[in-house]
Curated annotation (Swiss-Prot):
Annotated localization: Nucleus; Nucleus, Nucleolus
This protein's name: Zinc finger matrin-type protein 3
Stretch list, region Disordered: 1-42, 180-201
Assembly: Interacts with dsRNA.
Compositionally biased intervals (Pro residues): 9-20
Encoding gene (name): ZMAT3
Length: 289
């Protein structure tokens, strides 16, 4: 029975081999290749990139030649220490010269100059804080006397430069001028205070003077003189009465003013009286009277 079943069943169909053209058509239909660029364009792109890289490398080499660890040929500045070199390369003047250099060579400047030029075989000392610099936390760092001179409006790159400035002639001259101005201002303020104090004392004394004047006016006596007491010359001291008037006992004449009394002394009447009195005195001395 088993043999008959095998004989009755038809043989399985074998897949017919497809022609080679159909395989080619199927592969081209499923796989799409990108369009190929011309040969001239493919060759031009790597050449342009190589030219830019070579140009940038040449400029970096030239910049390294210009910016030595202790001499900046770009700014024509000789540096004494690594601290001064770092301060110079991070300063405004060097940054300006560096931007001009890159603008002339039509190449963008690097992000940091300190990565390009570094002092060789020298310990790096932290740069003193400059005026107006900020930390990442937003804290303001105030400048010290080794960084900035407020009197001369000058900033320093190192303590040695600051010490040389403070010992120079320009700083000494400005210091003398500032001291002279401060002394003159203090003297003027003291003079103003003294004047105000004096005026205040005089103002306080004015009521006392007024009271004294009213007491004198109200007082009555034999020697009361309502006029202000005038200055009496020495030669007329014997001719002044207690009331303040001038009196000539020889002529029995009085005068209220000094000029009037002097005119009386120069008059003929007074001179004749004086001559008569002198003659009488002489005769009395001789014993004729």
């Amino acid at each position: 029975m088993i043999l008959l079943q095998h004989a009755v069943l038809p043989p399985p169909k074998q897949p017919s081999p497809s022609p080679p053209m159909s395989v080619a058509t199927r592969s081209t239909g499923t796989l799409q290749l990108p369009p190929q660029k011309p040969f001239g364009q493919e060759a031009s792109l790597p050449l342009a990139g190589e030219e830019e890289l070579s140009k940038g490398g040449e400029q970096d080499c030239a910049l390294e030649e210009l910016c030595k660890p202790l001499y900046c040929k770009l700014c024509n500045v000789t540096l004494n220490s690594a601290q001064q070199a770092q301060a110079h390369y991070q300063g405004k003047n060097h940054g300006k010269k560096l931007r001009n250099y890159y603008a002339a060579n039509s190449c963008p400047p690097p992000a940091r100059m300190s990565n390009v030029v570094e002092p060789a075989a020298t310990p790096v000392v932290p740069v003193p804080p400059q005026m107006g610099s900020f930390k990442p936390g937003g804290r303001v760092i105030l400048a010290t006397e080794n960084d900035y001179c407020k009197l001369c409006d000058a900033s320093f790159s190192s303590p040695a430069v600051a010490q040389a400035h403070y010992q120079g002639k320009n700083h000494a001259k400005r210091l003398r001028l500032a001291e002279a101005q401060s002394n003159s201002f203090s003297e003027s303020s003291e003079l103003g205070q003294r004047r105000a104090r004096k005026e205040g004392n005089e103002f306080k004394m004015m009521p006392n003077r007024r009271n004294m004047y009213t007491v004198q006016n109200n007082s009555a006596g034999p020697y009361f003189n309502p006029r202000s007491r005038q200055r009496i010359p020495r030669d007329l001291a014997m001719c002044v009465t207690p009331s303040g008037q001038f009196y000539c006992s020889m002529c029995n004449v009085g005068a209220g003013e000094e000029m009037e009394f002097r005119q009386h002394l120069e008059s003929k009447q007074h001179k004749s009286k004086v001559s008569e009195q002198r003659y009488r005195n002489e005769m009395e001395n001789l014993g004729y009277v």
